[in-house]
Amino acid sequence: MAQSAERPRPYAFMTANATRPVRTRFAPSPTGFLHLGGARTALFSWAFARHHQGVFVLRIEDTDVERSTPEAVQAILDSMDWLGMQPDEGPFYQMKRMDRYAEVLAGMLEAGTAYHCYCSPEEVDAMREAARAKGLKPRYDGTWRPEPGKTLPPVPADRKPVIRFRNPIDGATSWNDMVKGPISFDNGELDDLIIARPDGTPTYNFCVVVDDWDMGITHVLRGDDHVNNTPRQINILRALGATLPEYGHVPMILGPDGEKLSKRHGAVNVMEYDAQGYLPEAMVNYLARLGWSHGDDELFTREQLVEWFDTRHLSKSASQWDPKKLNWVNAHYIKGMDDAELAGRVAPRVERRGGKPQAADLPAIMGLLKDRAETLEQLAEDAMLFCGEYQPAPAELAAQHLTETARAALADFAARARDTEWNRAAISALIKAVLADRGLKMPQLGIPLRVAVTGRAQTPAVDAVLELLGKETVLARLQAL
């Protein structure tokens, strides 16, 4: 498993011109399940690291103490494990790194790149309102920002300060985004960010910077809702004398209606797709194709994803979630899976339905059913025909199909079947013989056979169904008519 020490090993940053080993990270907040957008971001970071023989780091950003839960952490770990994205290092927990953040904050205060601000929230709100009234961008006005020759206000005796980062005023902060291309922010538009609260706890943007610095992160792939955070984080990294990572911001995933993907579009929790019977191989394939492409290839293995992955082929526009396309991809992986392996994945789902997969030839059943299935849940439900308790046909269905003519043909079939070898070819030949001798067409015997033996009018090929049920079971059910 991954390295789990809470303080990563020191990382020796190289010069900007030197080649650094690739180190990516996924840094979720454990305030709920891992959603599809987060899973896709993690997948891109994982694939990029694997492609470059680099290191994929998992960091748990758990500083929101009220909302972060151990259950949410476990849900994230379970989701990543299910998708096959095991980290090389971590998980690291921000709450266990508070001493390190305090150390860096103290150093910044000493260096003059951060300062104490004693403004109350109400005073800052008033500053912003005053700026709006003048048609300016609402922001903190720098009251407590140290400047040469500036006299600061008296320190209030009854107020604990926040710590603000002394953001550059002149110039611009720019980077060449791996997804969006060149992006630039005027430093004059960025106010002095709060990096520690009055109780001393560090804020999100500060923790992220220190973590990326300490962990030697070279490439940051994340959602484009973080674009506005990036210039602030870059400026803090520069103030610390750190080598900057490269940044890439991936557009969001939209629902089928073009709106932001949400619960109203269906499942957004990764593990719900496991419960619904989607294969992790299919989810990885489909998620990767949402916002990344390799020519016209729609289907590819995890190994091919790693081999082909390139940030130059990440889309600049939002991707649209398509449940039908996911079903198509999942069906492809189900059809291509070895019958025995597929049986192993379906067996627990059959058992949850009260079936007995061990009492049937489940691999052979998978071979019969898998070409029609889109999910493992559908396979498990269909397999209950062979593994579940037999339910005779409802009276209405029996009355419709088990006529006197049908019952006579079924009795003839049963009598001949006793001395017939029990395999699909022999059963098919027997059905044809009964049809020919009685002048019947296939539906006149095939449907009554299904209804009598399975309790259903629709099943896969009747000869295959009878073979898998076994001669003894088939004859016993026909005898009971």
Curated annotation (Swiss-Prot):
Record GO biological process: glutamyl-tRNA aminoacylation
Region (Disordered): 139-159
UniProt motif 'KMSKS' region: location: 260-264
Signal peptide: none
SUPFAM superfamilies reported in the protein's UniProt record: An anticodon-binding domain of class I aminoacyl-tRNA synthetases (SSF48163), Nucleotidylyl transferase (SSF52374)
Any one Gene Ontology molecular-function term assigned to this protein's record: tRNA binding
Motif 'HIGH' region, residue numbers: 28-38
Location within or outside the cell: Cytoplasm
Major place of residence: cytoplasm
Biased composition (Basic and acidic residues): 139-148
GO CC term (a single one): cytosol
EC code(s) of this entry: 6.1.1.17
Pfam families: Anticodon_2, tRNA-synt_1c
Binding, ATP: K263
Cited function: Catalyzes the attachment of glutamate to tRNA(Glu) in a two-step reaction: glutamate is first activated by ATP to form Glu-AMP and then transferred to the acceptor end of tRNA(Glu).
Matching NCBIfam families: gltX_bact
Record PANTHER family: GLUTAMATE--TRNA LIGASE, GLUTAMATE--TRNA LIGASE, MITOCHONDRIAL-RELATED
Subunit details: Monomer.
Family of this protein: Belongs to the class-I aminoacyl-tRNA synthetase family. Glutamate--tRNA ligase type 1 subfamily.
Name of this chain's protein: Glutamate--tRNA ligase
Organism of provenance: Bordetella bronchiseptica (strain ATCC BAA-588 / NCTC 13252 / RB50) (Alcaligenes bronchisepticus)
Lineage: Bacteria, Pseudomonadati, Pseudomonadota, Betaproteobacteria, Burkholderiales
Gene name in the database record: gltX
